C-alpha cells in the first residue's frame, strides 16, 4: 500500500482526473504519482524533477511497485511529450516559478484536459497567467495542513466566460463563491497581519508614510471581503 498522503497532497490527488494518465512536475520523491498509481486512481504516471538527488530517491521508491510510474529528469515540462498524459500537477513551489514553467511549456499543454496547481504563494500571478494562457478554473479548495493553509486549483482548457475581478484574482473566484470557514479564518489572519504592520508604523510615528496608506487600503479590502461573506 502506498504511503499515506499529507492533507495538502491529498487535496491535490482529489482533483486529478481519475482513470487518466498524469504527470507530476517537481515530483521530489514521487509520493503523489506513486499514491495515485498504487491506489489505481490513474493507470500510469510520470514523475518529473530537475534535481538528481530527489530523482534517485524517487526511482528507488517506485522500483518496488512493478511499473506504472516513470521517473524522468526534466526542467519543468521540457521532457514531457505532448499528448502522453491528460493531467498535470504542479505542487509545492512558488507561484512565480510555476508561471515560468507554464509559460515556457505552453506547447506541451496542448491536449491536456486538466492542470492542477498548488502554489506556495504568488497565487494571484498564477491565476492571472492561467487566464492569459486561455484556461479557466473548474475546481478550487482551501486546505489546512499542520499550521499552514494552501490553495489547490484545477484548470481546464478554454477561456473564462466571465472576467475576473481584482478580488477573484487575489483570493480565487471559486474560493470566494462558497461559504468556507477556513476562508474566513484566512481573511481574519491576513487582516491581523496587516493591522500589525500598520500599528508598527504608527508606533514609529509614520502614519503619513505611503506604506501606511497602502496598509490601510489593504485592511479596507479585506474587511469588505469579510463583510461580503457574513
What are these regions (language model features)?
Residues 84-92:
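Short SAM/SAH-binding signature in class I
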Residues 19-28:
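Conserved class I S-adenosyl-L-methionine
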Residues 1-20, 34, 56-83:
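S-adenosyl-L-methionine
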Residues 51-53:
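Conserved SAM/SAH-binding beta-strand->alpha-helix loop
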Residues 29-41:
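Conserved SAM-binding loop of SAM-dependent methyltransferases across substrates and taxa
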Residues 2-7, 78-79, 84, 96-230:
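Class I S-adenosyl-L-methionine
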Residues 44-49:
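Conserved SAM-binding motif I beta-strand of class I
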Amino acid at each position: 500500500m502506498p504511503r499515506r498522503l499529507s492533507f495538502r497532497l491529498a487535496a491535490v490527488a482529489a482533483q486529478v482526473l481519475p482513470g487518466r494518465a498524469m504527470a507530476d512536475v517537481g515530483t521530489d520523491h514521487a509520493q503523489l504519482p506513486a499514491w495515485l498509481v498504487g491506489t489505481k486512481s490513474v493507470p500510469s504516471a510520470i514523475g518529473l524533477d530537475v534535481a538528481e538527488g530527489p530523482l534517485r530517491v524517487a526511482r528507488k521508491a517506485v522500483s518496488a511497485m512493478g511499473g506504472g510510474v516513470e521517473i524522468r529528469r526534466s526542467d519543468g515540462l521540457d521532457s514531457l511529450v505532448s499528448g502522453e498524459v491528460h493531467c498535470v500537477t504542479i505542487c509545492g513551489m512558488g507561484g512565480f516559478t510555476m508561471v515560468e514553467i507554464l509559460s515556457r511549456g505552453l506547447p506541451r499543454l496542448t491536449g491536456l484536459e486538466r492542470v492542477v496547481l498548488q502554489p506556495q504563494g504568488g497565487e494571484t500571478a498564477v491565476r492571472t497567467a492561467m487566464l492569459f494562457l486561455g484556461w479557466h478554473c473548474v475546481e478550487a479548495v482551501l486546505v489546512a495542513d499542520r499550521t499552514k493553509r494552501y490553495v489547490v486549483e484545477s484548470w481546464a482548457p478554454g477561456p473564462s466566460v466571465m472576467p475576473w475581478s481584482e478580488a477573484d484574482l487575489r483570493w480565487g473566484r471559486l474560493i470566494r463563491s462558497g461559504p468556507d470557514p477556513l476562508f474566513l479564518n484566512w481573511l481574519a489572519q491576513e487582516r491581523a497581519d496587516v493591522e500589525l504592520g500598520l500599528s508598527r508604523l504608527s508606533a514609529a510615528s509614520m502614519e503619513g508614510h505611503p506604506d501606511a496608506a497602502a496598509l490601510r487600503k489593504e485592511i479596507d479590502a479585506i474587511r469588505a471581503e469579510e463583510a461580503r461573506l457574513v
